[in-house]
């Protein structure tokens, strides 16, 4: 079986994530020193976030690290599943590159499994739409 992964930048509604059995790796962000995790299960208040940005709040976003990818990928690999990760544009974030590096290391430990990490060259619903299309044809 193939397990699909993405990050929260795909901005997919939770109903579609569950319907298509997609695993979402969360981003973290900080607003004025307060760190939050933007996960698929969390209500992200985009209006408040961008209003804070416009008003000059100190905002930082965090790259998803290898540990978070490993934490998500390993249970699927151990269950005998291959993985396709569909990520945000490398022009915006290095997250897809980190996923690819993680994939390379994990395929050495699980040589019978395949992990493909894609940079979509898109973000938000552009990334999400690619993922949904893939979910319909990947089986």
PLM regions: where:
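Conserved small/polar residues in nucleotide/adenosyl-binding loops
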Residues: 137-139
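Short, ordered loop/turn segments at secondary-structure junctions
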Residues: 9-10, 29, 88, 120-122
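Short, acidic/small-residue loops that bind anionic groups at enzyme active sites
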Residues: 103-124
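Short Gly/Thr/Asp-enriched flexible loops that form oxyanion-binding sites at enzyme active sites
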Residues: 87-109, 129-131
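Conserved N-terminal glycine/acidic-rich loop preference
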Residues: 124-135
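Glycine-rich phosphate/diphosphate-binding loops that line cofactor/substrate pockets in enzymes
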Residues: 71-83
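Short glycine-rich or small-residue beta-strand-to-loop segments that form or flank ligand, phosphate
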Residues: 82-90, 116-119, 133
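N-terminal glycine-rich anion-binding loop in soluble enzyme alpha/beta folds
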Residues: 3-68
């Amino acid at each position: 079986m193939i397990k699909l992964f993405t990050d929260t930048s795909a901005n997919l509604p939770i109903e579609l994530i569950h319907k298509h059995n997609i695993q979402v790796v969360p981003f973290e962000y900080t607003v004025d020193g307060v760190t939050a995790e933007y996960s698929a299960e969390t209500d992200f208040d985009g209006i408040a976030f961008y209003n804070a940005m416009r008003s000059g709040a100190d905002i930082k976003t965090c790259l998803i690290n290898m540990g978070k990818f490993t934490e998500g990928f390993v249970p699927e690999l151990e269950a005998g599943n291959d993985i396709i990760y569909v990520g945000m544009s490398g022009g915006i974030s290095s997250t897809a590159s980190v996923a690819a590096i993680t994939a390379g290391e994990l395929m050495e430990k699980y040589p019978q499994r395949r992990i493909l990490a894609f940079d979509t060259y898109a973000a938000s619903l552009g990334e999400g739409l690619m993922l949904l299309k893939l979910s319909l044809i990947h089986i």
